[in-house]
Structure formats: C-alpha cells, structure tokens
Amino acid sequence: MFSTFGSVPILTVVAIQLFLIRNVLSLNLTNAYLHHKCNNTQGIYKRGSAFEKNLNIALRTVIFNGDFRTGFRYGDVGEDPNTVFVMYQCRGDSYWSNCRTCVTTALSGLRKRCPGNKGAIIWYDQCLFEISTVDSYHKIDYENDFYLSNPKNVSNRELFNRETSALLEKLTTKATDKKNIDGANQLVLYAAGEKRIGTKKVYAMVQCTKDLVFTTCSSCLEWIFRMYSDCCDGKQGGRVLGTSCNFRYELYPFLRN
C-alpha cells in the first residue's frame, strides 16, 4: 500500500518556476544532469486540462510538503484517465536538503526537456524524478536504462573486472538485507563500499528505489549487472542506471561520508 497525495490548492506554473529558480541557486555543483527520456507513448496533456491540474497538485506536494528524510516518494493524484503518478529517489548519501535540492532541479529540468509530456524521467547525479500515467509501484522497470563509463582503461582488465564485480555483488547482499532499514522503518536498499585491487582502490555503490522489496531489488540489480560487459569492461569507472535500480564504481571517492 502506498501513500497518495492529498488534496491541496493547485500550484500555478509561474509559482513553481519561481520556487525552482530560488532553489537552483543553491545547487551542489557535483549534481550533474545525466540523461532524460520523454515517454511520447503516454501522450501529451493540454493546458488547463484535468491532467495538468492533477500534475500541479502532485508537484506542489512533492516540493512543498515532501518529506526528504528517506530520499524517496511515490504517490498519485486524480482518477483514471487523468491519474498522475510521481516518484523521486535520491542517492543514498543525498537525503534531507541535498535531496530537496536535487528533486527541485530535476523537476525544473524535466519541464524544460519534456514540456507537456504525461510520462517522463530525468536522471541527475544525486536523484531521479519521474512522472507517469502508469502505476509502477513495486514493479521493476526493464525498459528505461542507460550507462556511462570512463574512457580510460585499467592495466589488468580481467583482475579488475573480477574484483569489481565481486564488490558489487557484496554490496547487493548488504543492500537487500531485510535488517537494513532506515528511521522510517523502510528498507534502505542501498549500500556503498570500497576495495583495494592491486595498487588501486575502487569505490562503489548499488541502490534500488524504495518501493521495491529486497527480492525485487536483488532481481533488478542482477539485471543491470548483465550490462557490465557493455558498459564497464576494463574501464576505470562506470555506472548503469535504470528507473528502479543502479550501480556505480570509480577509482576515486564520489559519495558523501
């Protein structure tokens, strides 16, 4: 069972944008834009439509009434065929004010890149944000993924691949531990760690969206690990990002302590 957004006054587009502009000024410069997808199959909404009104209610709730302590929110507004589903997930080290800043930036970026789309996803370094007409709660999204990698290669490819994969598998076990819960009694579904490989130290993380359970999180991570060879074979750094889960590793620290 998931929480739905309550009935609140509709936020005008102008008010949203003014709020976004103020918050973008405090953006952490490491929070880079990564990728987006405008889902044209879900259609385009019209100005003043019931869908737009529901969307504005959802966005108002996310930005002004959102609880960013756990870094995750999923909810819906309206009745079919104008139901709006909204979801954000912040990186495991980017909760509270860092999460709010990233979500605010992501919302602004989504409006600019996918204006009028009923379905769209945007990824930033510290969060992802999605609007949709489809209820995806507890479900793995197998359709939306991409990868990024460092163009530089390591010297011992086979050893590096083997040890990095082992680290990611270890982190998956930790992230999907049923005892790994946060202050809100939610599964954390996130883990980070490091490992020395020869003279190098590898830093890594894995994460799933908090609507998943430990079994589906494990399945999602196993799925994106299959893309390791395409993304990251012998590379000094790489990541695969989906809507439901992601992993990343680098030869330098990239997370907050």
From Swiss-Prot:
It holds the Pfam family Stress-antifung. It is found in: Secreted. Keywords: Repeat, Secreted, Signal. GO terms for cellular component: extracellular region. Residues 1-26 form the signal peptide. Transmembrane segments: none annotated. It comes from the Eukaryota. InterPro entries: CRR_secretory_protein, GNK2, GNK2_sf. Residues 32-136, 142-254 form the Gnk2-homologous domain. The keyword Signal applies. Belongs to the cysteine-rich repeat secretory protein family. This is Putative cysteine-rich repeat secretory protein 28. The gene is CRRSP28.
